[in-house]
A protein has these predicted regions:
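Charged catalytic cores and adjacent phosphate/nucleic-acid-binding surfaces used
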Residues: 13-14, 27, 35, 42-132
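Acidic, glycine-rich loop-and-strand cores that form catalytic or ligand-binding grooves
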Residues: 32
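Active-site gating loops and adjacent loop-to-helix segments of metal-dependent hydrolytic enzymes
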Residues: 1-10, 54
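Phosphate-interacting basic helix/loop segments used at nucleotide- and nucleic-acid interfaces
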Residues: 18-29
Length: 132
């Protein structure tokens, strides 16, 4: 409040809103046909490396995301198990001016013109790209 008194608490903050461990989350995601994709591993807070102190060998992730593409060589050197994985660079922007310039992109196939849902088609294509 205006006097800096606590007026309530939030028990399920987004960063800890699950009781699944890493293996269970990976298995569940895979079971539903998704890709478990560690995000912004190079961020100093909440990235898998900051939380665990390492990029684990298991579960076997097919891809990962960097917040800053300039950190790629450093992370490959520190964690050789990242070397042959797909990766994307994403700014994790929450403001328009923080969006990257488009120099990092993923090429996906053109959606068919047969009435297929474009968003469903692109979602599936992106999952396949990250999986392989």
């Amino acid at each position: 409040d205006a006097d800096d008194n606590i007026i309530s608490t939030e028990p399920d903050l987004l960063i800890n809103a699950t009781d699944l461990d890493l293996y269970a989350a990976h298995a569940l995601c895979t079971e539903y046909g998704g890709v478990c994709h560690p995000a912004h591993i190079d961020r100093q807070s909440n990235g898998i490396v900051a939380v665990l102190g390492d990029f684990p060998e298991e579960p076997r992730f097919s891809s990962f995301e960097l917040n800053d593409g300039a950190s790629f060589d450093e992370y490959i050197r520190r964690f050789p198990n990242l070397k042959n994985k797909n990766f994307v660079v994403c700014s994790d922007a929450h403001r328009l001016e923080a969006l990257s310039d488009g120099s990092n992109s993923i090429s996906l196939p053109e959606p068919p013109e047969d009435g297929t849902s474009v968003s469903a088609f692109l979602r599936k294509a992106l999952i396949e790209k990250l999986r392989n």
